[in-house]
Regions:
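Short glycine/proline-centered loop/turn elements that form peptide/ligand docking sites
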Residues: 83, 87, 108-111, 128-133
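Conserved catalytic-core motifs of GNAT/GCN5-like acyltransferases
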Residues: 101-103, 116, 121-137
Length: 143
């Protein structure tokens, strides 16, 4: 598996994965396109397996912090360590003395476990954060 920076040509496959992983709250084509093309403070990493994009993570950078705004792995390839590889790559590339933040659905137990195992801590709850009304757990990891 190869982790690389995203390219404009990745948009269709990222959108396909996004819709399959988040059917009720998927980002739009325009939202994903912005993440891929607005490079001032954003970065998207993708992971390829057998020359096919199978997962991605989208980041936004601020002063002394990085926000993981979206991450997904093709549902047919989940639970085999791809998400962990992407997350570790993200964490390995955080600038020194920065913190990483993310929101995760309160009921997304596999993702919560992944983040806790990576060292993230719960710091807050955002009520009714997602379009379906589910709360988000805000998590932070200080480097």
């Amino acid at each position: 598996m190869i982790i690389r920076a995203s390219e404009k040509g990745d948009l269709a496959r990222i959108l396909q994965i996004e819709k399959s992983v988040f059917p009720n709250s998927a980002w739009t084509r325009a939202m994903i396109s912005d993440e891929l093309t607005l490079n001032v403070d954003r970065k998207t990493w993708v992971i390829d397996s057998n020359k096919e994009l199978v997962g991605y993570c989208m980041l936004r950078y601020g002063p002394n912090e990085v926000h993981l705004v979206n991450m997904a792995v093709d549902p047919s390839l989940q639970k085999i360590g791809i998400g962990k590889k992407l997350l570790n790559h993200f964490l390995d590339n955080i600038p020194k003395d920065s913190s990483a933040y993310l929101e995760v659905k309160r009921g997304n137990f596999p993702a919560i476990k992944l983040y806790l195992n990576a060292g993230f801590k719960d710091i807050a709850i955002r009520e009714d954060y997602y379009p379906d009304g589910e709360d988000a757990i805000v998590m932070c990891l200080k480097k």
